[in-house]
A protein has these predicted regions:
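Short, hydrophobic/aromatic-rich segments at coil-to-beta transitions
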Residues: 23-25, 52-57, 126-132
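Transition segment at domain starts
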Residues: 27-31, 39-48
Length: 145
């Protein structure tokens, strides 16, 4: 019996996240446009990034409580690169429109501060309570939710 248990445990690979403070649920509170100095206050809106393992879920709960977008990402100590976005259409058993569908229009991601299908963000600040990311055109300020 012990041999079976050890064999079973040895064959399992436990995947853990190395995301550090990036993991979690983030409220997008402000978007600054770098070229113009303009600011959009989103603190009263419900726009969120959820980060877990290798996936970011972005959604605007005020517009659609159940659907948003998923993006893959890579990160280093000083930057995050989002890529491979998908529309979250819930479960595949919902017919032809169910399941996650790749998107090719970056405008769909703009409400979340993402302007390209692959976007690089510099980590200006990332700690347990606050995150500031800067792309070539925007600065995004988040608060941990």
């Amino acid at each position: 019996m012990a041999t079976i248990a050890l064999t079973t445990l040895a064959s399992c690979e436990i995947e853990t996240s190395d995301n550090g403070d990036f993991d979690g649920f983030w409220h997008l509170e402000r978007v600054d446009t770098l070229a113009t100095g303009g600011t959009t206050n989103l603190s009263k809106k419900r726009v969120f990034w959820g980060v877990q393992y290798k996936l970011i879920s972005v959604r605007d709960v005020d517009k659609d409580k159940q659907h948003g977008y998923y993006l893959r990402f890579t990160q280093t100590s000083d930057k995050i690169v989002t890529h491979t976005p998908y529309k979250d259409n819930w479960h595949q058993d919902k017919g032809d429109n169910g399941g996650d569908h790749p998107i090719d229009d970056p405008k769909l991601l703009a409400p979340y501060g993402i302007n390209n299908l692959e976007e690089e963000f510099v980590k200006e600040k990332l700690d347990g309570g606050q995150m500031i990311l800067r792309s070539k055109t925007l600065r995004l300020k988040f608060k941990r939710f």
